[in-house]
């Protein structure tokens, strides 16, 4: 997949089949759009183009909001889009000035004139232009005028739950990791660097890798204990992670840590990715470290049993 950072980098491609969006979750609904684009591109001997924005429009339009968190980092989003077989990714810098672009200008001057759109595929809730003023009806009118095709993908649902990034974010905030993973179509993950902790886990036989995130806008799933898969370089492991404040040792800062099963390597300053599979329990304050140790033994048994049943 070729990535273009700005319209000035983009070179027109043959019969471009295009979609536009922020694609925070890159979820199953988005995958349906990408699949349709690929099929259309094959039928017209064209190429697929995803148009997205950086930074996320909400960060520009609502710069003072303290609760803006996103499911995927920019790097993870791009990687997922590539995995779905897209040919070209055009990243348009989203500025205050660009946020004032009206719907007609966006379609005619950008999608039509600069990209040379042949066909456009959008989701059921797609709006475009300043203040999301452009509706699908307006899009169809512009498509007729400029002579390109437009298609809207209906809402996708699983178990009668309509798939949307908002629903996924809410599921993560509530700790409903299985629901979030189902709607995403893959396991929610956190990537970060391993930093030094207070080594209390090591003292009680459960050494942990403490993770420091490199993206302040990354959405962290709810506090609790989780069954996890861990990727370090090209190696994969099973383990159990904790997100919380470690109340048993009176820690006041939110920490992300993972105990990796059958693992005894020094990985300080290394980058690892934690994939969250299931939420095991709430974080609890125990009377002492011995009580915590006994509970961790039970947690490990629960997690291993869960993985063995997969």
Language-model region placement:
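N-terminal Rossmann-like or analogous alpha/beta NTP/dinucleotide-binding catalytic cores
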Residues: 59-124, 128-146
